[in-house]
Amino acid sequence: DYTIRSEFFMYRNKTIACVIPARMSSFRFQNKPLAKICGREMILRVLDNAKKCKHFDTIIVATEDQVIKDLVDKEEGCISIITGKHYTCNHRVSEVASDLKCDYIFNLQGDEPLANPEHIDYIVEYGVDHESDMVQPYRETLEGDTEDPDVVQMVVNNGRVLYLMRTPDIVTENTVVQIGYYFYKREVIEDYKNLDMTYVKY
């Protein structure tokens, strides 16, 4: 049982864990979890904001790197877990989900130091209130987004995500920009690691 806070943090009698996937290797920014922002490492900035959220009874950093675990282990109110190597953050969270006893999991990216706790709380409440299998927020596309490889774009149809991309492979009136938060029922993300990868990988 990884619960480290209390039932006080439950929402509508549902237990919610926050899993923060982080790794040192990155195509675009090597070692970014340890990059300092005003003197404090990025991954710790993410943790700071996760602790401000109202509904997380467990906060876990999931990483394949011992240096990240060693840093996080010095912090209070969270734990760290060493995972295997994974292609995506969702696969890393899926591995951890198998050992969690909770109703929902929020995937908060380890490179989101400006994550807004109020936005996160809203997503959690929306997902629980609507009994959603998964919630993936997005924003409208702005000028320059389609050419920026750091911006993940999504094609949506009737509220369902069809396709994610970093290059303008498909640009339609239904193209929007992904916001890097994922909220899902535990059993949904737990099964994710068992799914076959398709030829479409962003």
PLM regions and their residue ranges:
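Short, high-confidence coil segments that cap the C-terminus of an alpha-helix
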Residues: 56, 102, 130-132
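N-terminal glycine-rich phosphate-binding loop and ensuing alpha1 helix
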Residues: 12-63
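Short phosphate-binding loop-to-helix
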Residues: 60, 66-125
